Amino acid sequence: MTESHASSVPAELPAESPAEAGAADLPVAVAALYCFTPLPQFESLREPFRQRMSDDGIRGSLLLAGEGINGTIAGPRELMEPFIDWLRSMELDDQATPFRGMDVKWSYCEEIPFRKTKVRLKREIVTMGVSSIDPLRSVGTYIEPQDWNALVDDPDVTLIDTRNDYEIEIGTFEGAINPHTESFREFPKFVEENLDPQKHPKVAMFCTGGIRCEKSTAYLKERGFEEVYHLRGGILNYLEKMPEEDSRWQGECFVFDNRVAVDHQLQAGAYELCHGCGWPLTPEMKQHSDYERGVACSRCAAEVTYEQRKRRRMRQQQLDQGV
């Protein structure tokens, strides 16, 4: 188990990963990617990125900031890997191949799970709101999926899910602490109120694809925690690499696209999203009398006003018509 930096270790796609082998006939590739790397001229990348994605029929969202790139995108299988190669080999005026070490997690599906192509400029590629944190300077120790079970079995390890409530609701690792956050901005407050380097000598954290843990482990290191670990590549990498019979994962993994969640085979799961409150819905929840597609569910129906219902119904009609 070694400490390294986010932009220094390329995460290449194997010739045939377990996820790819189990999805050989699926025509769409989905790439969840990130890379912490200095981008002083990140604003200038927006248009060439958007144009290349549009030309290749790739949809989804990329975030660009002075600290790097983050996003999830999807497109025709035969065009996605060349696009990732294009990113990794890109040379900028002031840098040679800044995205060479970009971390990428692959999954596959029948249809592109995004409606639009977006390239956005941000202050942070994952918003924690702590300006002193720099994952390029210091992060926790990366743990490979095959070593994760042994680490979390250690009784001295405090295991923390750094994701938000609505994500944890549908799946997590057994024994993990839920910080009960609504956004990643709330995570520092959770740490301040609940964790102590003396009482919690070993802390292990995980998230969907690894990016939040780059900052959460850096934050704990800054606050004096010495043994801080995080799952390399996040839950998605664990689900790909770990045989299901040996897995400690329980449930499905929330993803930020129209699939809503993926199962242990990284295939679209059983959940849909309530567009009223943004929480995932089981098939059983959709049978509730308060559920109305695109409008509300039993969790939020009592808070939805008449005008909100009217607007949401109109929007759902537009979506159904492909507008």
UniProtKB/Swiss-Prot annotation:
Catalysed reactions, semicolon-separated: uridine(34) in tRNA + AH2 + O2 = 5-hydroxyuridine(34) in tRNA + A + H2O
GO MF, any single term: oxidoreductase activity, acting on paired donors, with incorporation or reduction of molecular oxygen
SUPFAM superfamilies, per the entry: Rhodanese/Cell cycle control phosphatase
SMART domains: RHOD
A single GO BP: tRNA modification
Enzyme Commission number(s): 1.14.-.-
Primary enzyme class: oxidoreductase
Domain annotation Rhodanese: ranges: 153-247
Stored InterPro entries: Rhodanese-like_dom (IPR001763), Rhodanese-like_dom_sf (IPR036873), TrhO (IPR020936), TRHO_N (IPR040503)
Keyword terms: Oxidoreductase, tRNA processing
Active site: C207 (cysteine persulfide intermediate)
Domain of life: Bacteria
Its biological purpose: Catalyzes oxygen-dependent 5-hydroxyuridine (ho5U) modification at position 34 in tRNAs.
NCBIfam families: PRK00142.1-4
Family, similarity comment: Belongs to the TrhO family.
Name of the protein in its database record: tRNA uridine(34) hydroxylase
Annotated organism of origin: Rhodopirellula baltica (strain DSM 10527 / NCIMB 13988 / SH1)
